[in-house]
Amino acid sequence: MTILSAITSISKPNKISKSAVSSFGGSTLSMGSNSVACGGCGGGSYGGSSGSGSYSSSGGIAIGLAVSIDLNISATVGAILGGGGSRGSCGCH
């Protein structure tokens, strides 16, 4: 859902800044409390870069998307390596 919001905002350059903050910052901050249990779902060491709304150009959206995708990949790899059982409720989607 976050990726779809960001892609939609790319087609509206005059609203990129607000969309970037709401689509990346909001979801990352809401998962911050789970960062320890999930092994890096948001918050933690990734929270600053993916949650910052300092990017206001379309290039910033692309960087934000890459970070968001990396977070999902790292959460998936962590679930595989850790057995996945205890990580099912952390909300890293």
Curated annotation (Swiss-Prot):
GO terms for biological process: sorocarp development. Transmembrane segments: none annotated. InterPro entries: HssA/B-like_chaperone, HssA/B-related. It holds the Pfam family Coiled. PANTHER family: HSSA/B-LIKE PROTEIN 1-RELATED-RELATED, HSSA_B-LIKE PROTEIN 1-RELATED. Belongs to the hssA/B family. This is Protein hssB. It comes from Dictyostelium discoideum. The lineage of its organism: Eukaryota, Amoebozoa, Evosea, Eumycetozoa, Dictyostelia. The gene is hssB.
